[in-house]
Amino acid sequence: MTNIRKTHPLIKIVNHSFIDLPTPSNISAWWNFGSLLGLCLIIQILTGLFLAMHYTSDTMTAFSSVTHICRDVNYGWLIRYIHANGASMFFICLYLHVGRGLYYGSYTYFETWNIGVILLFTIMATAFMGYVLPWGQMSFWGATVITNLLSAIPYIGTNLVEWIWGGFSVDKATLTRFFAFHFILPFIIAALVMVHLLFFHETGSNNPSGLISDSDKVPFHPYFTIKDILGALLLTLSLMLLVLFSPDLLGDPDNYTPANPLNTPPHIKPEWYFLFAYAILRSIPNKLGGVLALVFSILILMLFPILHMSKQRGMMFRPLSQCLFWILAADLFTLTWIGGQPVEHPFIIIGQTASILYFTIILIILPLASMLENKLLKW
């Protein structure tokens, strides 16, 4: 009798995705982040579901409902902090996953890569709306500032902003719809993840060498299931260390003050994982220009397959490109730091320089370096 996992219509899909999947034998720990992102999504959906049972999306009671969750609900504080810091873990894994894709040339799988970029946008939108829900000072002003950016769109901008707000300012209608979207989007993300995996399993996994690995593949289970479980344990450990020892480390103290439209916080800034994009936005004095730079700073990822000039896939054997990649990584750290600083000298000029460097490396220097490497190898 044939094994049920190979014949049953439903179990067969799971088998081909997680058990008998042919996997390159040399993939490193950088390939762990896909499964860790799946784990993060599950954690966020489960904790979010329990938070939604006690949360009220009304401007009068939203802040106190979060307080109620932390004080009166059994382990409510734990669920709330796992959800808040789980988002940070999600973005750490996300950025490392994207970085791995850039370094090893995984973007040559067009469909998988483009779905991935769409996923990144969707997750960013979800995280932004989630940050608004506790209705603290930074929630309110963050929502006001970021939604206001849409008013830079010519002709329809103002109408669009008022339509999103559901009125003439960020108020009850805005909070209610943000809660509705924040609830539904993770399920849309889960569906997109399925599509991401579908395209990914069409081509199979890339590997650190960038070479075709058909002759050297092993079954996913038990080799990589064990490896993924180790990654999951390390992720859970680091998340729980963060949650139980310093849950507010990555948050903003201003968000413990209830939202007040009459009192603007001295420094309005988003969560740490958006600071690099926020720094790029602020580095351009023109409003529309800033918004375009902000969108393009993420959308630029879709251009990588077009900008790939090298005859080798990854950067494993390309020292010049490796060097530029790490300069780009350092530049993103600089932008993240600048995004959290006040708009004054010398931070303005540092932010502008880092923003120009970011786009220049990706659009000009990396493709030129790739062509030079081809030349040096007489290809």
UniProtKB/Swiss-Prot annotation:
It holds the Pfam family Cytochrome_B. PROSITE patterns: CYTB_CTER (PS51003), CYTB_NTER (PS51002). Belongs to the cytochrome b family. This is Cytochrome b. A ubiquinone binds at H201. It is found in: Mitochondrion inner membrane. The keyword Membrane applies. Component of the ubiquinol-cytochrome c reductase complex (complex III or cytochrome b-c1 complex) that is part of the mitochondrial respiratory chain. The b-c1 complex mediates electron transfer from ubiquinol to cytochrome c. Contributes to the generation of a proton gradient across the mitochondrial membrane that is then used for ATP synthesis. Binds 2 heme b groups non-covalently. Its cofactor is heme b. InterPro entries: Cyt_b/b6_C (IPR005798), Cyt_b/b6_C_sf (IPR036150), Cyt_b/b6_N (IPR005797), Cytb/b6-like_sf (IPR027387), Cytochrome_b (IPR030689), Cytochrome_b_C_euk/bac (IPR048260), Cytochrome_b_N_euk/bac (IPR048259), Di-haem_cyt_TM (IPR016174). Heme b b566 binds at H97, H196. Heme 1 (or BL or b562) is low-potential and absorbs at about 562 nm, and heme 2 (or BH or b566) is high-potential and absorbs at about 566 nm. It is a multi-pass membrane protein. The lineage of its organism: Eukaryota, Metazoa, Chordata, Craniata, Vertebrata. Keywords: Electron transport, Heme, Iron, Membrane, Metal-binding, Mitochondrion, Mitochondrion inner membrane, Respiratory chain, Transmembrane, Transmembrane helix, Transport, Ubiquinone.
